[in-house]
């Protein structure tokens, strides 16, 4: 009967120290532009925050502040409901 396995520090994957040092600074484009509210009728802006498959891109990838991310979510959902934005771009052709 074997005893419990011990944790070996040498076998753990090494992190890239350079990527930790040169991290890109997060910046919210709405704060920089002085935008107070995001409008669902501004389709060109909303398309930047929707992926090719139709999903809303998360704030950790876009760098958007939480208050603006919530406004983006509601604006995209309203634009989809009014058929200004597609729910998905991957439609099958019959």
From Swiss-Prot:
GO terms for biological process: translation. The keyword Ligase does not apply. GO terms for molecular function: small ribosomal subunit rRNA binding; structural constituent of ribosome. GO terms for cellular component: cytosolic small ribosomal subunit. Gene3D superfamilies: Ribosomal protein S18. Keywords: Ribonucleoprotein, Ribosomal protein, RNA-binding, rRNA-binding. InterPro entries: Ribosomal_bS18, Ribosomal_bS18_sf. Part of the 30S ribosomal subunit. Forms a tight heterodimer with protein bS6. Binds as a heterodimer with protein bS6 to the central domain of the 16S rRNA, where it helps stabilize the platform of the 30S subunit. NCBIfam families: S18. Belongs to the bacterial ribosomal protein bS18 family. HAMAP family: Ribosomal_bS18 (MF_00270). This is Small ribosomal subunit protein bS18. The lineage of its organism: Bacteria, Pseudomonadati, Pseudomonadota, Betaproteobacteria, Burkholderiales. The gene is rpsR.
């Amino acid at each position: 009967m074997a005893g419990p396995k011990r944790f070996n520090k040498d076998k753990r994957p090494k992190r890239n120290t350079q990527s930790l040092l040169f991290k890109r600074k997060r910046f919210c484009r709405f704060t920089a532009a002085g935008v107070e509210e995001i409008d669902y009728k501004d389709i060109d802006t909303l398309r930047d925050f929707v992926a090719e498959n139709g999903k809303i891109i998360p704030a950790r990838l876009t760098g958007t502040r939480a208050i603006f991310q919530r406004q983006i979510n509601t604006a995209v959902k309203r634009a989809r409901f009014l058929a200004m934005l597609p729910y998905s771009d991957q439609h099958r052709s019959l």
